[in-house]
């Protein structure tokens, strides 16, 4: 594209960093650029003239600082308690320019308005391509007809930069979409699990010894946790190791030609008696006979493949004990100064078009390796060898290689010198011949036991001359002939013990991540750094990793759930799918749908199994003593949208009295609440959605009731809905009351009101037998017609003698007294036959109501209970029942209990000195 009339065009050039912008401007202008200030004081604008493919251009070169935009949730979802964390898997997200980048955005807008072309000089990887499209979005918003092109370069040297600007290409939309997919997946998964973990654990446990528990975020990252998993798994392997003693026979022979050490070909034995027998046989007949002396074999030790990012990080860690994060920081600085090529690359094979000899020639002046570089270039020396192909090519950058000679700059640290030396020596080794050695193995026989010794003689060091980081150890052994006999100099039985593997060092951890496909070459070091920064792992002086208590507890909790959220499999599949997007085999939408559906299912199930996480944390941490009522309420699980304020969700909560309720998260602005049955021992929100209630979704709650607190016939486990459709919950509230404080203080004789959503009055028109409305249980059409004796009757009500017959099995019923808070002192008939669920209030029969109340199973699935507080609502007055002298108390299940009650909570199953709520209440129980 050129301007009409052949005049110069104005070209806006944008680099990823200010230093890169200055370097590119310096190369293209040959140091003659003019500088002016932009809106951001860090991102200056460089002006110069240049010709692109013969087209005169007025070049404007500026920069961004990394990503120009951030991906965020819509405002409504940003506050932690504004929504159910599960909603974050489908909540709207948007890209926006953060406040600290607004000045850069203004600079781009102003310069784009007066430009004809936009040339993108961002780093040539997926992340750089994504930043490029962020720049495009900003510039096109103010000038839609910009001519947009992309410059591809791998080193900040004259040759690469001039070639890049003369061969501009289209930006790669697929690369940018792959990064968009990764950002959205990481945001949704990370935010949901981070909120879940933090709200669940932070206020329950004393995690931070510095006293900053309340501000701590217990984060989850899709790459971070599998990386932590490698560390924990190795740690567990070490902890589980049990040392085992073993024995081996060692033999050596000293001659005039030197020492030969022979190894037992059995290796070792774990049975001491067997080892001793074999050793004694050798001692009794110690003469050694040479059985086999093969001709020396030529062996080769090949140089390494060309250097990619992962190998650079691993080798810098092994050779110099540099962290991967620091290695990349130093390498980036060397790249920006023009001394090495772009350091973030997966490629480990050079293109056939690369001028390999020119890079060697640059190094011939170096005092340490210059002479070796000169020998490489001499044809008669035979030292040159084309580098091997490692099999990886990211199509964006060549392997890491030196681009400019230096014997050490004045501003370089020791780490800069080491990393530069590693890059240069590695490249020189790649283009060198392999080392050659002659290897000999001698086998001997002593009393029927075989031993062997190996010797190696180096014939040509070749690449090992320059690659000082590797060696080829070996010893020269004396010359032996087949059939030769000798007496060993030493023959010993030595004991040793098995040892566990060592803790993972940084190089090992990078290898695990690379093999499992966790992260990319550009991000692996960052994932490791985050583990250390967030206190999930520590690193010792030998660069070996150990998990902290918090890191181990989190992995243990998820492992106990049965989900492999800490294993690499799930993340490896995501990384594979994102790579498929970058090559066009899958769309961004397909990958997002697949990954997020899978992870949302994991999240919902993990939330149901949260007790596993709590149990694991209990092993490592003390319970926190700073949790107050308001904080415990904020840690609830979302049940539904609040139908009163329509602004926040309603969450399951447990107050300090141990009673459960579903309350609006917008409290105290909104006080909408649904109190649950008083006998509720445990309650957890499930992933089951009620098909009847709305506005949805309304998630069902899994209840576990105290057996002593519910009437016969009701199951202790119940999967119920608080949206208004669950008749079983309504009946339990009618009979047993709720845990609300107002109800606990009601006057004697006041009937409990049903507070399940959608019903504020007693539902007397619901059949307790079939759970249908419109008839009483005595008129239920699904029941067998009552015989003369099946209808419960009380023929002598004034004499406390039961004449009521069970209408199920015909047995004579027993008169008992209820002990639940809502009906304490009220008498009822129940069948003494084991397994029979017949139940009827005595006063309803005497009033000729004929309603025999029987419980029905809820059909809810059971689950293993945890330790409960053993109480429902606070102790109240008995309501409406007769308590004659001599009448014994019984539980609602019909079991007799003492007439003496706990004066703290009113429960007759224990005395006050054994009350489980003794230390958790304010003492007002009357």
Curated annotation (Swiss-Prot):
- What this protein is called in its record is DNA topoisomerase 3-alpha
Q: What is its EC number?
A: 5.6.2.1
Which note does the record give on the cofactor? Answer: Binds two Mg(2+) ions per subunit.
Q: Where does Mg(2+) 2 bind?
A: 123, 125
**Interaction with DNA: where is this region?**
219-224
Describe what happens without this gene. Severe developmental defects and early lethality.
Q: Which keywords describe this protein according to UniProt?
A: DNA-binding, Isomerase, Magnesium, Meiosis, Metal-binding, Repeat, Topoisomerase, Zinc, Zinc-finger
Bias type Gly residues, positions? 873-884
**Which sequence ranges does the entry mark as zinc finger (GRF-type)?**
806-845
Q: Corresponding gene?
A: TOP3A
Q: Where is this region: Disordered?
A: 740-760, 775-806, 849-890
Q: Which residues bind Mg(2+) 1?
A: 16, 123
Q: What does this protein do?
A: Releases the supercoiling and torsional tension of DNA introduced during the DNA replication and transcription by transiently cleaving and rejoining one strand of the DNA duplex. Introduces a single-strand break via transesterification at a target site in duplex DNA. The scissile phosphodiester is attacked by the catalytic tyrosine of the enzyme, resulting in the formation of a DNA-(5'-phosphotyrosyl)-enzyme intermediate and the expulsion of a 3'-OH DNA strand. The free DNA strand then undergoes passage around the unbroken strand thus removing DNA supercoils.
A Pfam family reported for this protein in Swiss-Prot or TrEMBL: Topoisom_bac
Q: Which GO terms describe its biological process?
A: chromosome segregation; DNA repair; DNA topological change; meiotic cell cycle; mitotic cell cycle; resolution of meiotic recombination intermediates
> Where do the catalytic residues lie?
342
């Amino acid at each position: 594209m050129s301007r009409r009339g052949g005049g110069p065009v104005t070209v806006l050039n944008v680099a990823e960093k200010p230093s890169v912008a200055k370097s590119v401007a310096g190369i293209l202008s040959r140091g003659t650029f003019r500088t002016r200030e932009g809106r951001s004081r860090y991102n200056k604008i460089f002006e110069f003239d240049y010709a692109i493919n013969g087209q005169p251009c007025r070049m404007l070169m500026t920069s961004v600082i990394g990503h120009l935009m951030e991906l965020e949730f819509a405002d409504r979802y940003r506050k932690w308690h504004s929504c159910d964390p599960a909603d974050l898997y489908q909540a709207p997200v948007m890209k926006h320019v953060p406040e600290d980048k607004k000045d850069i955005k203004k600079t781009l807008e102003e310069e784009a308005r007066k430009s004809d072309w936009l040339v993108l000089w961002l780093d040539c990887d997926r992340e750089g391509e994504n930043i490029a499209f962020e720049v495009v979005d900003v510039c096109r918003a103010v000038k839609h007809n910009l001519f947009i092109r992309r410059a591809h370069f791998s080193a900040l040297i004259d040759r690469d930069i001039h070639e890049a600007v003369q061969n501009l290409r289209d930006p790669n939309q697929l690369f940018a979409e792959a990064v968009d997919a990764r950002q959205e997946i990481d945001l949704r998964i990370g935010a949901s699990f981070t909120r879940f973990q933090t709200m669940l654990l932070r206020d329950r446990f004393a995690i931070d010894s510095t006293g900053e528990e309340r501000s701590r975020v217990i984060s989850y990252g899709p790459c971070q946790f599998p990386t932590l998993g490698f560390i924990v798994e190795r740690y567990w392997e070490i902890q589980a190791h049990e040392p085992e003693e073993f024995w081996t026979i060692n033999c050596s022979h000293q001659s005039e030609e030197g020492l030969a050490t022979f190894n037992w070909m059995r290796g070792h034995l774990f049975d001491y008696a067997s080892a001793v027998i074999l050793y004694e046989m050798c001692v009794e007949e110690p003469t050694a006979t040479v059985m086999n002396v093969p001709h020396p074999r030529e062996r080769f030790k090949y140089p390494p493949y060309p250097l990619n990012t992962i190998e650079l990080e691993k080798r810098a860690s092994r050779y110099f004990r540099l962290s991967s994060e620091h290695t990349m920081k130093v390498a980036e600085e060397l790249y920006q100064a023009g001394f090495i090529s772009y350091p973030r690359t997966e490629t480990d094979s050079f293109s056939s078009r690369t001028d390999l000899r020119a890079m060697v020639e640059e190094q011939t002046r170096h005092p340490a390796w210059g002479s070796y570089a000169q020998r490489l270039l001499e044809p008669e020396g035979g030292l040159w060898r084309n580098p091997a192909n490692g099999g990886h090519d990211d199509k964006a950058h060549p392997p890491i290689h030196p681009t400019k000679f230096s014997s050490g700059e004045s501003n370089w640290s020791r780490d800069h010198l080491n990393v530069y030396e590693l890059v240069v020596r590695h490249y020189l080794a790649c283009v060198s011949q392999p080392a050659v050695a002659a290897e000999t193995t001698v086998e001997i026989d002593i009393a029927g036991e075989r031993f062997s010794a190996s010797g190696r003689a180096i014939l040509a060091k070749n690449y090992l001359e320059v690659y000082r980081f590797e060696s080829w150890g070996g010893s020269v052994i004396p010359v032996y002939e087949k059939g030769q006999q000798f007496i060993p100099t030493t023959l010993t039985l030595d004991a040793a013990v098995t040892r566990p593997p060592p803790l993972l060092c940084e190089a090992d951890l990078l290898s695990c991540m690379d093999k499992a496909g966790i992260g990319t070459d550009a991000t692996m070091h960052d994932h490791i750094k985050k583990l250390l920064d967030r206190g999930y792992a520590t690193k010792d002086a030998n660069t070996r990793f150990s998990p902290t208590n918090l890191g181990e507890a989190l992995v243990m909790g998820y492992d106990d759930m049965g989900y492999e959220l800490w294993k690499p499999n799930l993340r490896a599949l995501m990384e594979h799918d994102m790579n498929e997007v970058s090559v066009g085999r899958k769309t961004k939408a397909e990958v997002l749908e697949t990954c997020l559906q899978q992870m949302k299912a994991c999240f919902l199930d993990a939330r149901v199994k949260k007790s596993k996480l709590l149990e694991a944390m209990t092993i490592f941490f003390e319970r926190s003593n700073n949790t107050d009522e308001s904080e415990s309420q904020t840690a609830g699980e979302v049940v539904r949208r609040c139908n009163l304020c329509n602004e926040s969700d309603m969450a399951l909560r447990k107050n300090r009295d141990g009673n459960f309720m579903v309350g609006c998260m917008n409290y105290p602005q909104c006080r909408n609440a649904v109190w649950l049955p008083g006998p509720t021992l445990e309650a957890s929100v499930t992933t089951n959605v009620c098909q009847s209630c709305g506005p949805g979704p309304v998630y069902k709650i899994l209840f576990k009731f105290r057996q002593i607190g519910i009437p016969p016939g009701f199951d202790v486990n119940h999967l119920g809905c608080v949206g208004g459709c669950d008749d079983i919950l309504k009946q339990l509230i009618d009979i047993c009351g709720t845990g609300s404080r107002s109800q606990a203080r009601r006057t004697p004789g006041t009937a409990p009101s049903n507070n399940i959503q959608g019903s504020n009055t007693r539902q007397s028109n619901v059949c307790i037998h079939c759970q249908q409305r419109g008839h009483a249980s005595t008129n239920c059409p699904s029941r067998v017609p009552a015989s003369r004796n099946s209808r419960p009757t009380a023929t002598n009500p004034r004499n406390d003698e039961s004449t009521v017959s069970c209408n199920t099995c015909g047995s004579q019923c027993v008169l008992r007294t209820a002990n639940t808070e809502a009906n304490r002192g009220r008498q009822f008939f129940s069948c003494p036959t084991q397994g029979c669920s017949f139940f009827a209030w005595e006063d309803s029969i005497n009033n000729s109501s004929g309603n025999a109340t029987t419980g029905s199973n809820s059909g809810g699935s059971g689950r293993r209970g945890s330790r409960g507080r053993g109480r429902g609502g606070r102790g109240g007055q008995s309501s409406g029942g007769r308590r004659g002298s001599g009448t014994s108390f019984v539980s609602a299940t019909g079991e007799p209990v003492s007439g003496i009650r706990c004066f703290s909570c009113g429960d007759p199953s224990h005395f006050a000195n054994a009350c489980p709520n003794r230390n958790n209440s304010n003492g007002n129980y009357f």
